[in-house]
From Swiss-Prot:
Family: Belongs to the universal ribosomal protein uS3 family.
Disulfide bonds: none
PROSITE patterns listed in its UniProt record: KH_TYPE_2
Gene: rpsC
GO molecular function, one term: rRNA binding
Biased composition (Basic and acidic residues): 221-232, 249-264
Protein name, UniProt field: Small ribosomal subunit protein uS3
Keyword Secreted included in the entry's annotation: no
Signal peptide: none
Superkingdom assignment: Bacteria
């Protein structure tokens, strides 16, 4: 009988990487590290259940463990002033041993609905809360397809609805080619604990194809006749012939395609993004302009600006690293107003000290705040410290600070376009 293989294991080394990456000394250390990795993952999925963890990657050396937690709500894992992250590090150090250094990196997901584990966990939670298993699957399927997935397949099995005989039921929409190795398919299995028994939830999500086809199945190959080998004749000396003049090759000039018309709204948006902000250069620096990559922030107190220069980030901002595949110097969550925040990278270049009124007159046109909010925020301050960056990139749209588990902005930094 044909059986369905795990799509994650089938694609390892083709379009998917191992989630545990290390090299052990001997068989004894291999067994020890395998058990530790399993305990680490089970503990993280249990403690960080509210953060919707998709998967956990582990990289090891002999004296260090790097753990990368991919989740949809990183603020819950980090906690207020990194309190939850410190507790999690301490708990994980008991698993791997105190002599081994533990580094925990929290990474946000671009599209949480593309994660099969998150969707399977949502269906399992709905079943545990006595929600209809059919409606739970249909809602999850609509959510995944609306986010741009190519297809999804769900399956629940057990005593569905509390009946005496166990059975299984599932739904499928879109394209889910399990045997096509170039298809990026994510698979997860979760369990729903109910009063009448255990119910298993399986989810397959097709994110799209990673490689294109080189040729179609209908391609026809022409058969060429095999030429017989001719007998070699003795070489006769011939007079050298003069090379014939070759005709000049005239290249055809391709006609350029007419440019597509650009909408006025998109053009205006591009101009705003690529806006050049004039800034006062530091002493001894060359005169020039700070481009849009130089994002500017204004601080109410000098100590907050000094903390950024000294890289004492724990006192004023929340931050987390990213994977070594996409190295980033500093990823922060900084405020756009007193109620919203943005995830992004900020590499500080210099600080310019101005009066509050001068700071608004010089940089207020690029601010996301209104003049009323600006005056209310800086009413007790005389000077403002303008932080100008070398490079800065925004990785999310402005969100409420509650989604980052924050009630106040990190030390009063304000984001300016």
């Amino acid at each position: 009988m044909g059986q369905k293989v795990n799509p994650n294991g089938l694609r390892l080394g083709i379009n998917r990487n191992w989630e545990s990456r290390w090299v052990a000394k001997d068989n004894r250390q291999t067994a020890l590290w395998l058990v530790q990795d399993d305990k680490i993952r089970k503990h993280i999925f249990k403690v960080c259940k509210a953060a919707q963890v998709s998967h956990v990657e582990i990289e090891r050396t002999q004296n260090k463990v790097d753990i990368f937690i991919h989740c949809s709500q990183p603020g819950i894992v980090l906690g207020k002033e990194m309190s939850n992250l410190k507790v999690l590090k301490q708990q994980l150090s008991y698993i791997v041993g105190r002599k081994t250094k533990v580094n925990v990196n929290v990474l946000p997901l671009d599209k949480p609905t593309f994660s099969a584990r998150i969707i399977a966990r949502e269906i399992a939670d709905a079943i545990e809360n006595r929600f209809s298993f059919r409606n739970a699957q249909k809602i999850a399927i609509k959510k995944v397809l609306a986010s741009g997935a190519k297809g999804i397949k769900t399956n629940v099995s057990g005593r569905l609805g509390g009946v005496e005989m166990a059975r299984e039921e599932g739904y499928s929409e879109g394209i889910v080619p399990l045997t096509t190795l170039r298809a990026n398919i994510d698979y997860a299995l979760e369990e729903a604990w109910t009063t009448y028994g255990l119910i298993g939830v399986k989810v397959w999500i097709n994110r799209g194809e990673l490689f294109k086809k080189n040729f179609s199945q209908n391609t026809k190959f022409e058969k060429k006749p095999i030429e017989k080998k001719r007998e070699q004749q003795p070489v006769q000396q011939q007079k050298p012939q003069q090379p014939k003049p070759q005709p000049k090759v005239v290249k055809e000039v391709k006609q350029e395609e007419p440019a597509k018309p650009v909408k006025a709204e998109s053009l205006k948006r591009e101009q705003e993004v690529l806006k050049v902000v004039e800034a006062k250069p530091a002493e001894g620096a060359k005169k020039g302009k700070v481009e849009e990559t130089a994002i500017i922030m204004i601080s109410t107190k000098k100590e907050y600006a000094d903390n950024l220069l000294n890289e004492d980030l724990n006192k004023n901002v929340f931050f987390y690293k990213v994977t070594p595949v996409n190295p980033i110097k500093r990823v922060l969550i900084y405020t756009t107003t007193g109620k919203k925040g943005v995830v992004g990278e900020f590499d500080l270049d210099k600080i310019e000290i101005l009066a509050v009124s001068t700071a608004w007159r010089k940089y207020g046109q690029q601010s996301c705040m209104s003049k009323k909010d600006f005056d209310e925020y800086y009413k007790d301050s005389e000077k403002a410290h303008i932080l100008i960056s070398k490079e800065a990139f925004r990785y999310s749209r402005p969100k409420t600070l509650e989604s980052y588990n924050m009630k106040k902005g990190p030390s009063g930094f304000q984001y300016l376009k």
